[in-house]
């Protein structure tokens, strides 16, 4: 029976895999494929900055349901970046820098075509300046243009609450003088601590507000690929078990060494692909560089 279920999951349409999930499940208690620095298909300094070879729509079609979004503010717009590197819609780097509206066009199109699905949208200012302004722009110039497309409460939603919507996770501070309702500004990840040191231990993140929830985050991105897998990723996977009340975020990506994300992923992704995941275990949201159909399917099928 188990083999039949696995086979059915493999052949089902990855674009609508959440249609098979009971809507009474919390979204963040599912095992979800995600993409790290998802907008970097076309990006400056590609050897060190390119983390994806597909656009947003193609990633979602492949089964990805969590997007790691990095932005900078330009006037009254939000532009896509990976650190100092600008992201574009095409190979032509003399074209206009990718705008948040371009990203959302992919998301809205996908959700319109697949209303059973939801997208976890982790939003971060990657420019280290105007942190609060980035949230102002995101809320007023983008989210409020299509509020029916967004889930912005500061709690983990049930799938039925979030189908056809984008779940907003705010990884930046906001201007507290603006009178925003903390309960309606997205799941609050503003206490996130960058894991910049070469220490393998994951970190705890507690959200703010009356519905405080705890996340365990593994994002030790300073390691070279081999120790990254052996000292950080694999031990974290080994520690997984059934749901115990803490939400999990696990990054397979790494910026360590000089080989760049693509070459690093050629070491880490096959390691993860050959790692045995248990059907009844909770692995959380797994962010990847250069995911394949095999990788997304591996994560998705643990939900069935």
Feature annotation, model-predicted:
Residues 71, 111, 127-130:
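A cross-family signal for N-terminal binding/gating loops and helix N-caps
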Residues 78-83, 96, 127-147, 156-159:
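Active-site periphery "cap/insert" segments of enzyme catalytic domains
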Residues 115-129:
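Active-site groove signature of glycoside hydrolases
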Residues 142-162, 287-304:
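C-terminal domain-boundary segment and adjacent tail
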